[in-house]
Amino acid sequence: FNTWVGYEVISPAANFNYSVSYLFSNGPFSHLGVKADFALSDDVSLMLAVTNPWDTNDISGSGEYALGGQLGAYGQYLNLYYDSGTNGGLGFEIDYTGGFDVNEDLFLGVNAAYNNNPETDSGFYGAAIYPQLSTSDDFAIGLRGEYFAFTQDGFDDVPVFGLTLTGSLTKENLIIKPEIRLDSFLNDNEPFLDSDGVATNSLSSFLIAAIYSF
């Protein structure tokens, strides 16, 4: 089953932005195991899970397992994941996912996470906001603003700031999404290449995605 951790999901039809966040890319994607959901009240829920280590969708060759949980209340969710961090494991991650209806046309989504792997002395942390404005029944525009940083003991953090502006036009089962994305790494990190093949700290991109659901 798909992960309970994070604001964004694997299916592009369910995400507002077409490209995915750093928070999504560095968390778990899917799990093989069992989970139990409990409705504590009309507005409060609890989920507990025992799975193979993250993204191990077959037999756990290491013989290890992972634990997970989710507490939901009034549309806000606190998510937990833990494995030992060995054999390529993720370690410990705590994640908050939620959102608020500012008015009938404006929604504000929020995601924040912290990860630590004691085996590799590494991890990450970050936060993202997702304001989304519906301008008509067929069209909406949304922004993702994200701050994310990789961590490694003994080294400076590697932070990145990202902005993604997405339009979403829906016609029956078809969604058209034009999108502009800007990524900028800080602390003199230059992971990208410009048009001349020279290392640079920033990247701008544009795409138009067509998503058909059936």
Predicted features by range, described:
Residues 73-80, 86-214:
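Outer-membrane beta-barrel pore domains
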